[in-house]
Each structure stands twice: as structure tokens, then as C-alpha cells.
């Protein structure tokens, strides 16, 4: 379910077999945003099928918010119980719609209108978080999302400095989100955009582990409920992939803070 300010777009009547039409940056802006997000989400599902990465939950509910640039994976429609006052501050004038259209994913499209690549990368990043949610559940997600929202409200930066309560949840989650975003962007556009490299967490850890022989599915399999900081992440990787211990130790040492 994809919503843009709780409105709908239609392409008119067509046969039950489907309808071909060209939607580009010169088309209706709302329709373009929805198509870009829909296509990116579909591509992510296909990537999960091909690589063995855990699928996001079914029936995800998207909000596309042109008033915001940041995006988020709140998973409210799937039961993540977040502080309503915090979410209201984050969503601003759309807060009154929370109870009616509890979002799983919000896509902040401000300054991205007509830019397919940015909408694509943003969407697959949030879809990677939804895969993570499938692994860890609602209690874990409440701590993670609360850290993100609180940091954004207090500082304007969703990730903070890495020192706040539950920062480790953010560390693991954003490493995974940026790793998948960069990987899928590179496969689609032929270059690594390097998103997330200047923050206090290190998505390159996963990139180098993949280059050393661990698959995305291997990495995803370690993102369980008990992995909530870099120390527990490393321990899970070593426990599950002891044959790669030399690689794991080397990479984590390289990116230790």
C-alpha cells in the first residue's frame, strides 16, 4: 500500500492483462514518485528471492511525504508500538493521520522529485530495514526507531553521535541499510555511491565481508534479536562462520572506533 498525502493516482481503465504506459520525470509528480517507489520495492523483493536475504513482511504500508527529506521504517502497521508524541513531532502536519494510516515505511521525497535514482536508493534502504524487522520483531524495533526519531527531533540528524541510549541498535541497523542500498545501487547504476560512509557506524564492514566470501544472506542471518551493537554482531558472525574468523577479525579491527 503506497500513499502520498493519503491520496490516490489512477491510470484510467485498461484490460485485465495490464496496461503499458510511460511514466517519467515530466509526468505528474505524485504518480512519478509512486511508480519509482513501487518499482524499487519490487526490485528489492526480487533481489531477496535471488540472494536468500530475508523478505520484508507482507502488506507493507508506505507513506511518501513531500514535506520531509529523511525517510524511516517505523513498522507501525506491523505492530511496532512507538511513542505517539515522538512520531507526531517527526511527521509534523501529517501526524493526525497516524491512527488511520499507521505507516511501516515513510519515504521523504523533498528535493527528490523527478530523481528516480534517489527515490530508488532511498526505497531499497528502507526495504532492507524491513527485512531486518522480519528477523528481530517489534520490541527490538521500538528501541531502534525511538533512537532514530529522538535523534532527529533533538539534533536534526537521525543517527546522533553513537553515544545515546540504544545507539547500538542504530549502528547495526544502519550498517545493514546502507550496505544493501549501496550494493543494489551499484548493481543498477554501475557505481558504488558510498552512502553512509561518513557516519559513526561502518557499513563498509559488510561490504568487505562480502568481498571476502560471506554472502548477503550469511550476513542477514546474523541480524537476530540479540545482535544490537558491534560487539554482539561480531560475536554472531564468528559463531556462525568460524571458517571466516580471520577475515571477520581483520575487518572489524580495521573499522574499530
Description of each model-found segment:
Residues 1-4:
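Conserved small/polar residues in nucleotide/adenosyl-binding loops
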Residues 15-30:
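Acidic/histidine-rich, surface-exposed loop or edge segments in extracytoplasmic proteins
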Residues 26-35, 109-114, 118, 162-168, ...:
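Second-shell loop/turn segments in exported
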Residues 34-102:
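Auxiliary, metal-adjacent structural segments of Zn-dependent hydrolase domains
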Residues 75-137, 147-148:
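Active-site scaffold of zinc-dependent metalloenzymes
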Residues 134-166:
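Post-HEXXH active-site segment of zinc metalloproteases
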Residues 157-213:
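Metalloprotease/metallohydrolase-associated module, dominated by Zn2+-dependent proteases
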Residues 188-257:
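Pan-zinc metallopeptidase signature
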Amino acid at each position: 500500500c503506497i500513499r502520498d498525502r493519503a491520496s490516490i493516482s489512477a491510470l484510467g481503465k485498461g484490460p485485465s492483462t495490464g496496461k503499458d504506459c510511460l511514466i517519467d520525470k515530466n509526468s505528474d509528480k505524485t504518480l512519478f514518485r509512486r511508480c519509482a517507489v513501487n518499482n524499487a520495492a519490487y526490485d528489492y523483493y526480487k533481489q531477496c528471492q535471488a540472494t536468500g536475504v530475508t523478505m520484508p513482511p507482507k502488506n507493507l504500508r508506505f507513506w511518501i511525504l513531500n514535506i520531509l527529506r529523511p525517510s524511516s521504517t517505523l513498522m507501525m502497521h506491523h505492530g511496532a508500538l512507538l511513542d505517539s508524541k515522538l512520531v507526531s513531532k517527526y511527521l509534523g502536519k501529517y501526524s493526525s493521520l497516524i491512527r488511520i494510516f499507521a505507516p511501516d515505511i515513510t519515504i521523504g521525497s523533498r528535493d527528490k522529485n523527478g530523481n528516480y535514482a534517489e527515490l530508488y536508493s532511498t526505497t531499497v534502504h528502507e526495504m532492507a530495514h524491513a527485512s531486518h524487522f522480519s528477523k528481530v520483531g517489534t520490541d527490538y524495533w521500538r528501541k531502534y526507531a525511538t533512537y532514530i526519531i529522538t535523534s532527529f527531533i533533538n539534533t536534526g540528524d537521525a543517527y546522533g553521535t553513537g553515544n545515546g541510549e540504544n545507539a547500538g541498535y542504530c549502528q547495526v541497523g544502519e550498517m545493514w541499510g546502507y550496505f544493501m542500498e549501496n550494493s543494489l545501487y551499484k548493481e543498477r547504476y554501475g557505481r558504488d555511491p558510498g552512502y553512509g560512509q561518513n557516519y559513526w557506524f561502518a557499513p563498509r564492514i559488510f561490504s568487505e565481508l562480502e568481498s571476502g566470501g560471506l554472502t548477503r544472506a550469511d550476513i542477514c542471518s546474523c541480524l537476530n534479536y540479540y545482535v544490537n551493537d558491534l560487539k554482539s554482531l561480531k560475536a554472531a558472525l564468528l559463531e556462525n562462520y568460524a571458517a571466516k574468523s580471520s577475515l571477520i577479525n581483520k575487518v572489524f579491527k580495521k573499522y574499530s572506533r
